[in-house]
């Protein structure tokens, strides 16, 4: 079924093929990828767009000696297949299976672990400098998408790379533009010309010759930029000190191979701009690359058929609240760092386009942009994943909290996230948020509480974070009427005897289940800051054992807040802290992951009984 692909286990075998065979290999690889992802789920459209590029890179460069650094990394399935992990695709993103992103501990061909965007150029530059210091001729290649290129970190790295004059190749995978045939042909010719040794040598010689007359050099440089600028968009990258080549068709293996082979012979920073199409070769994905960005299992012949959910996900609850709140208050603006679909902002972006701001993959900018808007009387709501808010921690403190500005942070994907693994887990937000002065941190236990907490956060004139998990809640009916949740107050949901389970957010449901068997008092704590200290003291006075349960790292989390409260009052009581342990958790089924962490009904009961037996 796959005559060429079946012969390839590692890139060295790929390099034994004739160039004329590579288009067939691309077809086989694309077919295998569609069939494989259809069985497991995963990222599809982005991977279909990088088939030819992946083949060309491994064909021209001596991997793994030469270093490939894939930005974000969800487009590396073809790379994994060609580097000895084809059989592992059957367990992609599953517990014990291969990851959906590059991981150094998974393969020597994964030169650098990625999953968050815009890190590739910095990492590849570090590798290029290391090669120079170690006096080895080794190529470092960063492959970055047009979305990731919008982040400040990418431009910081470009700026530094040009100054260092390192042997670095940056490949911009641009799937947000198209080339008309005549312009494409012209640019293909220019790519061959500008990536060749003659052009590079002549350019350096001309610079040396004209360097004795600085005004002439500057005039020549501007003339070159003017001519190239008429047919290429690369002047910006030339200003950073790169030799810009492209744009070229990223699905044309002949031009890719020729251009990469030419670039391989050059010294100094090189920038190759390729144009690809997401979903290439699979019509449904080409027509709707957003739908096919991340998919569950599906039948290739039928495509992805969206299944109606029996109850709303927390993301949808947030999106609906945002629209309802916007209708009531014209000061509300919604901000997202390039996560419109994932954060539930599609409806808001359509109903309130003038108040919707997608700032690109720029979390730092998103937070400070919100702070500036808040200074002028607007009420910004920043919709962001827990793992991505980490990238704007300084802005959170310096620009929002110190100035005590009324910015609402709607923190999605708090806690474990399943198949995306440790890079996307929201394991740390309670710990890194609660130590910041002026900020209020709350977490809903169910769908209705999520809506009411968002409303409560919006009414405050101080920084506020509402963190909620991925997926759906326990199925509580949502009240459309919005009400204030008493600030810093928990609620007792079940009265017991010796044991008190202090549940934070999503952990209320398993605590209620465990509470019945343990005859424990179960408390919905609601807030980690301000913590309901009065309730904690009452519980300590009436019980033998307090148990804090949170979907956050134990270190510095909600349980630590309870412990600090007790210590400050000189209360000596047995305390058991349950949460995520001090290690990174691999991908897996969310329910199984919670079980492995001891955060389901069975795990909570087991831990409590073990502590009571001491």
Swiss-Prot record:
Cofactor note: Binds 1 Mg(2+) ion per subunit. Binds 1 thiamine pyrophosphate per subunit.
Gene3D superfamilies: 3.40.50.920, 3.40.50.970
EC code: 2.2.1.7
Bilayer-spanning residue ranges: none
Catalytic activity: D-glyceraldehyde 3-phosphate + pyruvate + H(+) = 1-deoxy-D-xylulose 5-phosphate + CO2
Pfam family, one: DXP_synthase_N
Annotated Mg(2+) binding sites: 146, 175
Required cofactor(s): Mg(2+); thiamine diphosphate
Any one Gene Ontology BP term: thiamine biosynthetic process
Cross-referenced SUPFAM superfamilies: Thiamin diphosphate-binding fold (THDP-binding), TK C-terminal domain-like
InterPro entries assigned to the protein according to its UniProt record, in alphabetical order: Dxylulose-5-P_synthase (IPR005477), THDP-binding (IPR029061), Transketo_C/PFOR_II (IPR009014), Transketolase-like_Pyr-bd (IPR005475), Transketolase_BS (IPR020826), Transketolase_C (IPR033248), Transketolase_CS (IPR049557)
Known pathway: Metabolic intermediate biosynthesis; 1-deoxy-D-xylulose 5-phosphate biosynthesis; 1-deoxy-D-xylulose 5-phosphate from D-glyceraldehyde 3-phosphate and pyruvate: step 1/1
UniProt subunit comment: Homodimer.
Record protein name field: 1-deoxy-D-xylulose-5-phosphate synthase
Taxonomy of the source species: Bacteria, Pseudomonadati, Pseudomonadota, Betaproteobacteria, Nitrosomonadales
């Amino acid at each position: 079924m796959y005559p060429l692909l079946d012969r390839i286990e590692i890139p060295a075998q790929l390099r034994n093929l004739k160039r004329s065979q590579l288009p067939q290999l691309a077809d086989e690889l694309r077919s295998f990828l569609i069939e494989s992802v259809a069985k497991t789920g995963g990222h599809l459209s982005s991977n279909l767009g990088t088939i030819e590029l992946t083949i060309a890179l491994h064909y021209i460069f001596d991997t793994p000696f030469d270093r490939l650094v894939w930005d974000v990394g969800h487009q590396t399935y073809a790379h994994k297949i060609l580097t000895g992990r084809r059989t592992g695709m059957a367990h992609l993103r599953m517990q014990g299976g291969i990851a959906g992103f590059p991981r150094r501990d998974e393969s020597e061909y994964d030169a650098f672990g990625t999953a968050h965007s815009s890190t590739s150029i910095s990492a590849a530059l570090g590798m290029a400098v290391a090669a120079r210091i170690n006096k080895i001729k080794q190529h470092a290649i960063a492959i970055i998408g047009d979305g990731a290129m919008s982040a400040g970190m990418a431009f910081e790295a470009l700026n530094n790379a040009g100054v260092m004059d390192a042997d670095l190749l940056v490949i911009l995978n641009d799937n947000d533009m198209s080339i008309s045939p005549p312009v494409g042909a012209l640019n293909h010719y220019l790519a061959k010309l500008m990536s060749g040794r003659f052009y590079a040598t002549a350019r350096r010689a001309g610079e040396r010759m004209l360097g004795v007359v600085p005004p002439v050099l500057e005039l020549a440089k501007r003339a070159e930029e003017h001519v190239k600028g008429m047919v290429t968009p690369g002047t910006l990258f030339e200003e950073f000190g790169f030799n810009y080549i492209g744009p070229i068709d990223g699905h044309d293996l002949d031009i890719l191979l020729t251009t990469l082979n030419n670039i391989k012979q050059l010294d100094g920073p090189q920038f190759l701009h390729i144009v690809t199409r997401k979903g290439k070769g699979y019509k449904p994905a080409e027509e709707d690359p957003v739908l096919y960005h991340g998919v569950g299992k599906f039948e290739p012949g039928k495509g992805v058929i969206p299944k109606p959910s029996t109850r709303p996900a927390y993301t949808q609850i947030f999106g609906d609240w945002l629209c309802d709140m916007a209708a009531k208050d014209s000061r509300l603006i919604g901000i997202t760092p390039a996560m419109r679909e994932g954060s539930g902002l599609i409806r808001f972006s359509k109903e309130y386009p003038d108040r919707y701001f997608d700032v690109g993959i720029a979390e730092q900018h998103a937070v400070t942009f919100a702070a500036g808007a808040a200074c002028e009387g607007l009420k910004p709501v920043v919709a962001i994943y827990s793992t991505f808010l980490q990238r704007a921690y300084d802005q959170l403190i310096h620009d929002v909290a110190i100035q005590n500005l009324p910015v609402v942070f709607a923190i999605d994907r708090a806690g474990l996230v399943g198949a995306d693994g440790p890079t996307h887990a929201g394991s740390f937000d309670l710990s890194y948020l609660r130590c910041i002065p002026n900020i209020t941190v709350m977490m809903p236990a169910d769908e209705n509480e999520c809506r009411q907490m968002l409303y409560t956060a919006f009414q405050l004139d101080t920084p506020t974070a509402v963190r909620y998990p991925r997926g759906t809640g326990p199925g509580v009916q949502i009240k459309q009427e919005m009400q204030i949740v008493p600030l810093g107050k928990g609620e007792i949901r079940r009265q017991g005897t010796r044991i008190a389970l202090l549940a934070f957010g999503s952990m209320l449901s398993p605590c209620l289940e465990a509470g019945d068997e343990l005859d424990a008092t179960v408390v919905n704590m609601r807030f980690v800051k301000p913590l309901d200290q009065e309730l904690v003291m009452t519980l300590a006075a009436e019980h033998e054992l307090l148990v804090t349960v949170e979907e956050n790292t134990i270190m510095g989390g909600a349980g630590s807040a309870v412990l600090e409260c007790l210590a400050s009052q000189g209360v000596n009581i047995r305390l058991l802290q349950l949460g995520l342990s001090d290690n990174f958790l691999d991908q897996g089924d969310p329910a199984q992951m919670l079980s492995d962490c001891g955060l389901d009904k069975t795990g909570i009961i087991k831990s409590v009984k073990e502590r009571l037996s001491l």
